[in-house]
Amino acid sequence: RHPIDVRFIEFMPMGEGTRWSDSCFWSAPDILDAVKGLVAVAPVEQEQRNGGPARLYTLSGPDGPGLGRLGLISPLSSHFCTSCNRLRITSDGALRTCLFDDREYRLRNALRHPKLGIEAVRRIVTLATRDKPIGARLLERRHNAVAQRRMTAIGG
């Protein structure tokens, strides 16, 4: 009855000491296959997506098409690094250009400094986006954490 989007996010190996195994990993294609066993699934056209990392699908059941959509975010099985357009600012004022890269750019001091202002922030963001990694080499680092900070410390 309501247009609710539901997203499934594959396991993201984040945080110091994270270890994982293929036997405990449920991939986005496996999730999609399970959903296809229940309802009809159709991909959402690119121009109707919100620009995020999720691959979106409409669902139709015996009562007709659903109002919401299914989104699958697949950092491991079908990584989205080359199309990523995201930046994150952590709660302690650091800019991160990639969840899976530990490089951070300090924004807090520039934001708080009365004389630096928006131009200093703009320079930092420009530098950070110029250095944004194209791919995080997730599969090369399999079974180990790819970033030291946990998602709860990064935000997202």
Label for each model-derived stretch:
Residues 65, 78-156:
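Radical SAM enzyme core and accessory elements
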Residues 1-70, 75, 109:
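Radical SAM enzyme [4Fe-4S]-AdoMet core and its adjacent flexible, acidic
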